[in-house]
């Protein structure tokens, strides 16, 4: 994946690094790479999403 950052003439290195970091975080490159390291079956992925949702509902009902 490529991150293209346009640098204006006379712009400081710190400013350019800040732009790069923000763009990197928005692109979620690290998360995508970690997900692609191993194959997860669609059924397992759905099960994981459902368990997270149930846990969130449990926390909400517990606090109410």
From Swiss-Prot:
GO biological-process terms attached to the record: translation
A Pfam family matched in the record: Ribosomal_S21
Positions in coiled-coil regions: none
InterPro entries: Ribosomal_bS21, Ribosomal_bS21_sf
Entry keywords, A to Z: Ribonucleoprotein, Ribosomal protein
One GO term describing the cellular component: ribonucleoprotein complex
GO molecular function list: structural constituent of ribosome
Domain of life of the source: Bacteria
Keyword Ribosomal protein: yes
Family per similarity comment: Belongs to the bacterial ribosomal protein bS21 family.
Protein's name in the database: Small ribosomal subunit protein bS21
């Amino acid at each position: 994946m490529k991150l293209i950052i346009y640098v204006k003439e006379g712009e400081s290195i710190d400013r350019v690094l800040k732009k790069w970091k923000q763009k990197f975080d928005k692109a979620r490159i690290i998360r995508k790479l970690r997900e692609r390291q191993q194959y997860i079956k669609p059924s397992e992925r759905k099960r994981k999403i459902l368990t997270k949702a149930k846990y969130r509902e449990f926390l909400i009902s517990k606090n109410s």
